[in-house]
Amino acid sequence: MKPFLKWAGGKTQLIVEIERNLPPLVLFGKFTYIEPFVGSGAVLFWMLNNFPNMERAIINDINSDLINVYKIIASKPKQLISTLKDFQYKYHDLQNKEAEKKEYYYEKREQYNARNTDKVIQAALFIFLNRTCFNGLYRVNKSNSFNVPVGSYKSPRICDEQNNQRHQNHAHDCPHRRR
C-alpha cells in the first residue's frame, strides 16, 4: 500500500533503514506504534501491512488539516471518494484548456483556504491540492493559507479508489491526535 499523499520529508526512502533498527519486540511481541509526524503515512502503512502483532497505532501531526484527512478516510470514505472523483472528472475535463485548468485549481485553493466547508469537502480539497499543486508541497503562509502554485501535471491521479479503500481499512486502527 502506497501513501495517498505526496509529502516533503516523507520517510518512504528510509523504510529499509527503519526496519534494520526496529527493536525485537516489534518482530516478536505485541506493541503499540506511535507515529509523531505522520505526514503521508508511509511508515505507518508499512507497519500496518507488515506487523500483524501491532495492537494499535497512534498518529500525530501538528497539521490539523492533515489529521482531518485521516479522520475522514476512517469515518466517511465513500463521501470522500465521491467528492475526489468529482474533482478529478472536472479537472481532467479541462486537460487541453490550461487557463481554465489553472482557474479551477485556484478556485479550489481559495475554497480550501476559506475553511468554511464541511470536513469531508475540506479533506477532499486537501488531497486535490496535494495531487495537483507544484511537486505536492504543503506550504502555508503566516495566515495559515495554503499558497503553493498549480503544478504542471497533465492528468494527475486525484482519486485512487483502491488505495483509498486500503487506507480506510487500516485507518480504524489509528487514534488521531494533533499536538
PLM-predicted stretches and their roles:
Residues 1-32, 37-38, 42-43:
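S-adenosyl-L-methionine
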Residues 177-179:
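Short loop/edge segments at beta-strand edges and connector loops
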Residues 45, 50-173:
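Class I S-adenosyl-L-methionine-dependent methyltransferase module
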